[in-house]
A protein has these predicted regions:
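Hydrophobic alpha-helical segments, chiefly the membrane-spanning helices
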Residues: 305-309
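Acidic, glycine-rich active-site loops and adjacent beta-strand->loop/helix elements
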Residues: 80-85, 110-116, 155, 221-222
């Protein structure tokens, strides 16, 4: 199947949702060679991935995942694509923890280093959190605490068949956007930052196709895969039936514009210390962006409109 798909994509034709799903299923089962996987990923990247192709690929990822079964209603995920190269503090991680502490049920899906010098797994370990690979225990913690981190390699073991081709390519591919679309706890309310403005509306439509109840997808000034307090943020909101696209500014929320340097991160120890400072009540640009992101996560849970639109 993958060879047929490669030929079709090289000729500039789009795959159907079913075709993309079938190719990804074959990759997840280890039925494609590393060379075939690499060729497919590059061909798809050069053509440009469509909503149908991303949706089908995400469906295959979900099917192959080790799921966390829980009765918790209204789960929210704040996973983003990473890969913006900005090396900020872990904004979505801090926001997820604040939202969880405020009563939002957060199933945060994530991995290790992508856009920051450390990502959620690294900073949570620096904060003393143990990464769990027991879905039953994860469900228990989520239900009792209101927050659980779902470490992607524990839940998407079939991804091992694409690891080496991706590593050797060193390019962004469709896999870079599949993480936020493949939450192992089935979160249907999402706040998703993307590394490319061109992906904002596309990802919102994909989330709608995948059954999301509500979603905010955004790309911020400074090239951030985050809500930005540096300048304008482009947002695509999946309302449950349609996609609304708009832009917000820091001033809309009464926030003073920040600089990229204000939000700069470091290694896991540095970022963990920054998060502790925010939690201790320190005010400033890092706290501002954390609270703004948190309000978006809370809005996804409570169906409150994004303030200042």
């Amino acid at each position: 199947m993958i060879l047929k798909a490669i030929r079709k994509v090289i000729d500039g034709a789009d795959l159907t949702r079913g075709e993309a799903r079938g190719v990804m299923q074959a990759i997840m089962r280890g039925e494609s060679t590393p060379a075939q996987v690499a060729c497919y990923l590059v061909a798809l990247r050069m053509k440009g991935e469509t909503v149908e192709e991303i949706t089908g690929s995400a469906e295959a990822m979900r099917e192959a995942a080790t799921m966390v079964i829980t009765d918790v209603d209204g789960l929210v995920d704040t996973a983003g694509t990473g890969g913006d190269g900005a090396s900020t503090i872990n904004i979505s991680t801090a926001a997820a923890l604040v939202a969880g502490g405020a009563g939002v049920m957060v199933a945060k899906h994530g991995n290790r280093c992508v856009s920051s010098k450390c990502v959620i797994a690294d900073v949570l370990e620096a904060l003393g959190v143990t990464l769990l690979d027991d879905p039953k225990r994860q469900a228990e913690i989520l239900e009792s605490v209101g927050f659980m981190f779902l470490f992607a390699p524990f839940h998407h073991k079939a991804m091992k068949h694409a690891t080496e081709p991706r590593k050797e390519l060193g390019l962004r591919t469709v896999f870079n956007v599949l993480g936020p679309l493949s939450n192992p706890a089935g979160a249907r309310r999402q706040v998703v930052g993307v590394y490319d403005e061109a992906l904002v509306e596309t990802m919102a439509r994909v989330l709608g196709e995948l059954g999301a109840e509500q979603a905010l997808v955004f790309h911020g000034a400074g090239g951030l895969d985050e809500i930005s307090t540096i300048g304008p943020t482009k947002i695509a909101e999946w309302t449950g039936s349609s996609v609304d696209v708009y832009q917000v500014q820091p001033a809309d929320f009464g926030i003073e514009p920040a600089t990229l340097n204000d939000l700069a991160g470091g290694d896991s120890i540095h970022n963990a210390a920054a998060i502790r400072s925010i939690f201790a009540g320190e005010v400033g640009p890092q706290a501002d962006v954390c609270l703004l992101y948190t309000s978006d996560a809370a809005d996804e849970r409570s169906s409150v409109d994004l303030g200042g639109r």
